[in-house]
């Protein structure tokens, strides 16, 4: 693994590039580049994480390719000392292509909200596309963004819904 830092990562404007070179974990070959960019401003945390050319190949030849980008922005608590009032907005998209032809695309339809005091995402909608099938996962349902481990999974153009329990 090669890591290149332009400055200490906590400094606004810093960029950390992680490149996997001839790297194996539990005999799986891991490739690609991960770039973390610190875009923080005015005391609020803001950063991106981008993976390009991600690829995992298992000893049996199976595996997948992955590309994605995530934007994280502090939306509450930046002006206070305790972290318990902090909350973050997460947006992004990714594409995973499995060797067998399955393609999974994830895209935030509305920002995912993660409060520090809550172990689950409390609001936001994630679009999940598996080949041609489209699903939506609404983290705000059924309690309008309150902290709970429930989310509404919708598919078939909204004709089917199921309230699911998150781990």
Regions found by a protein language model. Give the residues of each.
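Short, hydrophobic/aromatic-rich segments at coil-to-beta transitions
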Residues: 10-21, 44-52, 87-92, 120-125, ...
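Short linear motifs in intrinsically disordered
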Residues: 3-9, 78-85, 114-118, 137-145
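Short N-terminal edge-element motif at the start of the domain
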Residues: 2-40
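Generic structural detector for well-ordered beta-strands
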Residues: 2-4, 19, 107, 127, ...
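Hydrophobic lipid-interacting interfaces of membrane-associated proteins
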Residues: 21-30, 52-59, 95-102, 131-135, ...
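A cross-kingdom marker for long, charged
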Residues: 127-167
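Outer membrane beta-barrel transmembrane domains
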Residues: 107-131
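Short helix-loop boundary/capping segments
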Residues: 35-116
């Amino acid at each position: 693994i090669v890591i290149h830092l332009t400055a200490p990562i906590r400094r606004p404007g810093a960029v950390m590039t992680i490149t996997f070179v001839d790297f194996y974990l539990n005999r799986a070959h891991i490739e690609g580049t991960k770039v973390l960019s610190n875009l923080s401003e005015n005391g609020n945390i803001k950063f991106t994480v981008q993976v390009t050319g991600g690829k995992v190949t298992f000893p049996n030849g199976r595996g997948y390719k992955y590309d994605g980008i995530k934007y994280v922005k502090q939306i509450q608590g930046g002006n206070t000392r305790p972290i318990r009032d902090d909350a973050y907005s997460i947006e992004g998209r990714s594409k995973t292509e499995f060797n067998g032809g399955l393609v999974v695309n994830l895209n935030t339809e509305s920002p995912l909200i993660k409060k520090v005091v809550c172990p689950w995402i409390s609001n936001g909608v994630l679009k999940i596309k598996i080949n041609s099938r489209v699903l939506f996962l609404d983290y705000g349902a059924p309690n309008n963004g309150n902290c709970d481990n429930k989310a509404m999974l919708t598919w078939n153009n909204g004709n089917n819904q199921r309230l699911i329990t998150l781990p």
